């Protein structure tokens, strides 16, 4: 009875904030996002909105990937490990900054990172593919850069930026070099069309992932190929929202 009363008071407080507080407009936006982004239960939606609207907690990710990890997949976990491939800007749009603020550690992978001040992840300034030692042409566009042969939806925009030649490595080598744990709680993968090639460089018999957010940008057959590949590795798609598919072990 007491638990139900506490939940009722909590729900009423959130509704009050959303309805009439000075933060109401922003809170309503947060409520809408939380209803759609992360496969939350109704109570989880309210809790997440309360953290943002009342508690002032911020989640920098573009479409709620960090909220999904924190609120849906690993609630209460403060010692998780992540692999952020295509980490880009260290704060704006980051899928892993909020995890670090909870105490998580991890690896950030990006050949041209920016604004990493204050971040604690091990920074690997490399380009990853299915095999190491390949020379690739890489467009350096901030946020949309990637391997020239793999660029998809934003190719025309990315090609406006300078291109450089880089030598590939694999995610397996990155993980081995960092002495990463065999269980990685969260993989964030956003490298503008080269996601499947990067995954082919992971020794899945050595490393397992508890949750994955992988960008697809509605590009076919890339999206379907990603799904098939990950299903063969023992994962299932548990959620989709905007440009990302979300995976967990079967």
Language-model regions: role of each:
Residues 2-250:
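Phosphate/nucleotide-binding beta-alpha loop and adjacent structural elements of enzyme active sites
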């Amino acid at each position: 009875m007491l638990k139900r009363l506490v939940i009722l008071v909590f729900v009423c407080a959130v509704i009050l904030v959303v309805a009439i507080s000075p933060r109401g407009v922003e809170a309503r936006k947060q409520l809408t996002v939380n209803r759609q982004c992360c496969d939350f239960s109704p109570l989880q939606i309210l809790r997440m909105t309360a953290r943002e609207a009342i508690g002032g907690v911020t989640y920098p990710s573009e479409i709620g990937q960090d909220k999904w990890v924190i609120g849906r997949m690993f609630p209460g976990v403060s010692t998780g490990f992540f692999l952020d491939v295509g980490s880009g800007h260290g704060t704006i749009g980051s899928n892993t900054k909020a995890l670090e603020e909870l105490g998580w550690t991890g690896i950030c992978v990006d050949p041209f990172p920016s604004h990493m001040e204050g971040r604690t992840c091990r920074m690997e300034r490399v380009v990853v593919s299915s095999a190491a030692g390949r020379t690739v042409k890489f467009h350096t566009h901030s946020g949309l850069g990637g391997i020239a042969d793999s660029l998809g939806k934003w190719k025309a925009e990315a090609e406006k930026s300078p291109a450089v030649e880089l030598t590939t490595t694999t995610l397996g080598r990155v993980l081995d070099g960092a002495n990463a744990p065999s269980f990685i709680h969260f993989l964030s993968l956003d490298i503008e069309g080269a996601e499947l090639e990067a995954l082919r460089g992971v020794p899945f018999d050595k490393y397992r992932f508890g949750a994955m957010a992988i960008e697809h940008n509605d590009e076919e057959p890339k999206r379907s190929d990603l799904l098939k590949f990950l299903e063969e590795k023992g994962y299932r798609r548990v959620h989709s929202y905007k440009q990302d598919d979300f995976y967990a072990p079967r």
